[in-house]
Amino acid sequence: LLSTDMSEENAAFDGVSPSTTTTQSGDSHITWDNGFNPSTTGTYMYGFLSNGSLSGGVWSNSEIEDDKRITMNSGADSMSLTSSVWYYERGDKNGQAASYSYPTSDLPCAKVCIAGDANGDGDIDWNDGALAFRDIMNIAQGADDIKDLVNYRIVMNFAGMATNPYLETADNIKKVYLATDGLPQAVMLKGYGNEGHDSANSEYADVSEREGGITDFQNLIKIAHQYNTEVGIHINAQEAYPEAKSFNETMLTSPITNGWGWLDQSFTINKLWDLGSQARYKRLVQLYDRINGTSFYSGNWDKGEYVKDSQGTLNASMSEIAADAAKRTDNMDFIYLDVWYQNAWETRQIAKEINSLGWRFSTEFGYEGEYDSTWSHWATDAAYGGAGLKGWNSEIIRFLRNDQRDTQILNYPRYGGTADNPLLGGYRLYGFEGWGGDQDHNSYITETFTENLPTRFLQHYYVTDWEDYGEDEACPTGNTEKQITLKNDTGDTVVVTRNTEQRSDSYIERTITLNGKEVLNDVKYLLPWTDENGDQKLYHWNLDGGTSTWELPDGWTNLANVVMYELSDQGRINEKTVAVSNGTVTLDAKAATAYVLVKGESSKTLKVDYGEDNYVVDPGFNGYSGTDSALDAADWSGDIDNAAVTVEKYANT
């Protein structure tokens, strides 16, 4: 589909092989003099050819193993790109050995892009082909959401303790909404089902009664959507527990093999049977029915009618269910697929099942679901998994998809290599709702503003030019990125440049400019952000505290003054008017304290107080934080001797 030969002296191939190790890039750069091996064939995830005048790439929807969708053939004096093989029936080479009735794949498709100096930097290289490639590549369902989800976190429930009932999670969404002035959120419920995390794995419709049941779960989704928040769940399609209502020996591998065994012994699911029999999809549809009040699966959960060994029928096609999901405003938003080890074809199939129900697809491991996954746990949870299992270590992939997903290498200098201060940052998972023992809300807010808001700001732009340090240049970090340029469709330009002076902590030393104006320097910034109602505001953060002066962005420079609010878990406080002088403002900030600047007085309040749909108003006392005397005992008196009140006292043991 694309080729070059030795008559083109400046020809080069640039491609990507899978690597999630922070110190080993998956990128290959081959020229006639460096790396060219005649009469050989290699397979790659992405591939580009350039010749000094043009640069091009090939896209394919091949479902080949390891997502190596592009084949590069080297002749005696040529390099060419074509699609890797396609599978139409029964999936990959391993799947063909089985006899289940699999769904057929999409019809084969390949596309070619060719560009000149697409980014206008005066050089024609893979950057130009990659920029053109964005117009032909697939985009995962829900990928456009990622750049907005500044508050992405895990909510943990385990072993029947119900430490985070659904409506408490709703209150925490409101608390973070106030503390971040409405920055979008995504909460992933790790333990939404049965008695919590890993209980009754594979039984997706078993929404936990102890955490509030299906009604509270539905109310959580409705409340979350009012506060610009996505709700998703952790599921497992690898293992089944005997306590699951649909557990049966037919669904297990033969011979039976053990899976994870910390609550009860789980057993490995025969994924090909689960796919081919439609049992897995039926279990997912039964969950969809419970959330949305539909009846696409014939079995009624409340009547004890479970999928078992693929009993019951689906009353609509996958496309018909997808059409229903597209119309709903209070459907769940995403699925996180835990411990999934299958290759590309099977992963594409389960992603289709999940996407058809209106749910964005995300995975545990960075190497899974390259075609469809929008978020990876091990790519974002810094210490989790070790240096060898993070996100994709590829400048080419990050160039193409930085704005679409959280599956790249994040900033974690102790792992070295690409993780040592990447210029674009990378979403880092923090929380306060139990996962990993995290319970510190204040620490969560600090890291959200220090690391994750700048990452999300950059993801609102796509990469157009990538410059690394040369071999003869001294780079102050293990990551050799020197300067990255990004743009958006309206013509705004962002430039991220590495600062040579290094801090003593792990935060990234860089300068970010927007249309030539500095908006971030190391750990202080004044970043523009568009609110959910379309209004623009500016977030100010200075980790070290102190005074700093900033040029205001276009649309703000002619103002006489701006209004600055300090942010707290009670929302905006300590209003202050700041004068504008020659298009600049000088801001005095407390250390590690967030501020928001707006063009005039305004408010950001809760639509309904804490405790919405609950039995008690504000059961977590969130509305009293920092109010001191409002918690005096005299304000909380009552008749404890009333016969209707029962007091139970327990001795410490």
Language-model features: locations:
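Extracellular glycan-recognition surfaces and repeat-rich motifs
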Residues: N622-T653
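Proteolytic processing hotspots in large secreted/extracellular or virion-associated proteins
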Residues: E532-W556
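Glycan-recognition surfaces
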Residues: P242, S246-G312, W359-E501
